[in-house]
Design a protein with these regions (language model features):
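Extracellular glycan-targeting catalytic surfaces
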Residues: 14-212, 223, 250, 292-295, ...
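Bacterial N-terminal signal peptides
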Residues: 5-15
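Long, repeat-rich segments with strong aromatic
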Residues: 227, 231-327
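Active-site-adjacent structural elements in folded domains
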Residues: 95-96, 184, 188, 206-217, ...
Length: 394
């Protein structure tokens, strides 16, 4: 299949057998100028993986991802001792270079894949492949498929389960790989190697002590564990893990995280209740977007008392539309930066026939230059995601 023809076909593949609906058809021309402007800039940037950033405080090696817990600071009463926690206050001295490199990957590869799907121009797919080879294949630069040393805390631990959330940025990368592969833009041999990396990482998420610790977290961390395993299982064709994630969504996430009014009490209890509520809702919506099928539609699933995604969206949408109505505390940091173009509005609006949510999504800011916002807005290329139920991703 020629590259241009393959890219044109991707739109139909993403839309499912019935073809794209009116909103999906309107999305591609809406996104085209934004996507191409970004992708053209990214063509000038060469891949850079974690091996370019030595981490002196890491207990691991040069291929091991390392980060330090955001909210941990030196103890004034014991300056050389273990750090202490200050919830919601990020320590600017902590090591974040590996996270920044991963976020850069998650910004650039999906944009390049989206540009390829819109235009059929091989240069976009080829540059995306350069990044993918550097991160997941090349022996000299690849990242090891674990987060054993993520979110370390000085004087306390060399890594912990909480760090698993750092790889939420691989969710849209996995999607980009799938889109490129469906259109024949990733050679079979490369795809096998990329799949192998994600298969090994999924195994680590599911079996390691740190992975299991994050799985059992009761708030957005537990949500993001399911989202990641779902996305990576989708890429690798692991139907058993996909089904496990569907079951966990219905039996763990919705019952333990969602209140009767559609709020997330564990997020409201944090020092950034608005931002965390948006973040968790986007993660829940992304799980549904990845895993919902005609026979097991997570979008319409609800508990006997009515708790489900419809209620969660109905709770949060008014406060996205008019933040001044938010009745809870203001976020201690970055409060003025939210809301952004939240994926939950688009995904849920399309899946649950909430056109006002889709219209609202179109009015919101798509991109930010604020690092913390980029970090917490992990779905940035809707062209890669929109499809009717029952499509090859749905």
């Amino acid at each position: 299949m020629k590259v241009a023809a393959a890219a044109v076909a991707i739109g139909a593949l993403l839309a499912g057998a019935s073809g794209p609906g009116p909103e999906e058809r309107g999305l591609r021309p809406l996104e085209r100028p934004r996507v191409l402007a970004a992708a053209n800039a990214y063509l000038e940037r060469q891949p850079q993986t974690i091996t370019a950033f030595p981490a002196a405080r890491s207990a691991g090696g040069p291929h091991d991802f390392f980060s330090e817990g955001d909210y941990w600071w030196p103890n004034p009463a014991d300056p050389g001792g273990p750090y202490i926690r200050r919830d919601g206050e990020s320590n600017p001295q902590n090591f974040v270079e590996h996270r920044r490199a991963l976020i850069r990957l998650s910004v650039e590869v999906p944009a390049l894949a989206a540009a390829w799907s819109l235009t059929g121009r091989a240069q976009y797919a080829e540059h995306a492949r350069r990044h993918l080879r550097a991160w997941f294949i090349a022996p000299e630069s690849r990242m090891n498929p674990s987060l054993q040393y993520a979110q370390a805390i000085h004087g306390i631990t060399t890594g912990r389960g909480t760090g698993v959330i750092d790889t939420i940025h691989l969710v849209e990368v996995a999607r980009a790989v799938e889109v490129l592969r469906l259109g024949g833009a990733v050679p079979a041999a490369e795809f096998v190697e990329i799949q192998r990396w994600f298969r090994e990482y999924t195994r680590w998420l599911v079996t390691s002590p740190n992975g299991r610790e994050e799985r059992d977290a009761k708030n957005n961390h537990g949500t993001c564990w399911v989202m990641q395993v779902a996305a990576f299982a989708r890429l690798t064709g692991d139907r058993a893990q996909e089904q496990m994630c569907r079951t966990r969504f219905k039996t763990v996430l919705v019952p333990t995280e969602l209140a009767a009014d559609g709020s997330f009490p564990l997020e409201l209890a944090r020092t950034k209740p608005y931002g965390y509520s948006l973040f968790n809702l986007d993660a829940m919506a992304t799980i549904c977007q990845i895993l919902a099928t005609a026979s097991d539609n997570l979008w319409t699933f609800s508990l006997p008392d009515g708790r489900g995604m419809g209620r969660a969206l109905a709770f949060m949408a008014p406060y996205i539309r008019d933040k001044s109505r938010w009745p809870y505390a203001r976020d201690v940091e970055y409060d003025d930066e939210w809301p952004m173009r939240q994926a939950s509005l688009l995904f849920g609006g399309l899946a649950l026939n909430r056109p006002d949510d889709v219209a609202l999504w179109k009015t919101l800011k798509a991109d930010s230059s604020v690092d913390e916002v980029v970090r917490n807005l992990f779905i940035r290329q809707p062209v890669l995601w929109t499809q009717a139920p029952g499509g090859p991703f749905g």
